[in-house]
Amino acid sequence: MGNICINDLDDYVILVDGKIKSCLYDLRNKKLYHINHRLSKLIQKVKDIPTTYLSLDEINIIQDLNNNGIDLSNIVTIEELRKSVSLSKNQIQFAWIEVCTTCNLRCIHCYNESSSMCKNEMSYDDFGIAVKVLKNMNVNKIQFIGGEPLVLGNKLKDMITYASDKFESIEVFTNGTLINDEWVQFFDKYNIKVALSVYSYIDSEHEKVTKVKGSYNKTKQAIEKLRKRNIKYRVCNTIMKDINIGNKNTDLFTLSTKKDIVRMSGRGNLNLLDEKLIKKKLITKDYFSHPLNKSVIKSSLFFNNCFGSKIYIATDLTVYPCVMERRFSHGNMKENTNFKLDDAIMKLNKDKINGCKDCEFRLGCFDCRPDSLTGEICSKPWYCTYLPEIGEWELVENSLERIK
């Protein structure tokens, strides 16, 4: 194989061996095939041999692969691929910038454990340092987060104004309760996108999460203002035990009933999950019956699927790999004038994870390191039910018992 760009992998079928079994990742058709080691070895043996040298059984196996749309000449082992793929110098594409830890709400699951008692703020000068470093890294998308960024008032406006011509995309993540007409005009002027958190279509259920009465109506009114002004916005929700999402009763937003089940970070903990949600969260055989996520596979070849393309800058300019991951950091921008990211953090993919590095599914399995029940950085996801050491899936009831 010659040098190929990581974005030009769509015609390949990647062969990944595990401890007992193997997987074929058919990127063109977005399909995954779980096979035994015997077939894996046979594929590696015959893929470059003329059929005249093969046995009838071997020819029949090749024909079966062809019938499933797999061309033997397109199969490449993960080891071969890693030797041939050329990477662009820049990997980080997005940065969260935490401008404060103060929040006017008290959300029960807050990954940042923010509240009105938290008083950390990023100074304007430090923000300038962060922007300079991000520009040097060719980062083109940023998101202002908190806490609640809008509690900063004019200070946040000054930061946004300064950054407005330096990035392709700027978004503010907010609970929406402080958005008024003045903020909407400001967002419109500087082409700022807005992400908002809403937890239910029912005001009382939403406020079970935020712990502040009246917060639902304020957020909903903010969304109405944003839409009226044609501001680009999106609504995010986290799914938790005992929080009834309710029935859709507005055309302002749509809440997910499946994605983003609460993670074990910050105030997020097992007490916010019931058996039904844990079952939804489990990685089971059915997880791989859906079309393959090619972006996850491509990023996981060399990098952690998140840490390789995103960073999180805290108020004191410490740089973490994720908004939820503070067990380790890349260092501090302020303390290092020649700041560089830690390559080992960016490349913390499933090849380095206990219980995953010998798993044939590791290339197509999305990894969220912060979503952990232990302090161990390299622990296997607690919600995974596959046992690569024996090549079998754990019974769901056994998984539930283990987690409890």
Regions of interest found by a model, annotated:
Residues 42, 46-57:
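Short acidic, hydrophobic short linear motifs in intrinsically disordered regions
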Residues 2-4, 12-17, 188-320, 324-330:
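Radical SAM enzyme [4Fe-4S]-AdoMet core and its adjacent flexible, acidic
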Residues 56-57, 64, 68-185, 189-193:
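Conserved alpha-helical substructure of the radical SAM core
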Residues 1-45:
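Acidic, low-complexity/disordered tracts enriched in E/D and polar residues
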Residues 114-118, 207-214, 374-375:
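Short glycine-enriched, charge-decorated loop/helix-capping segments at active-site entrances
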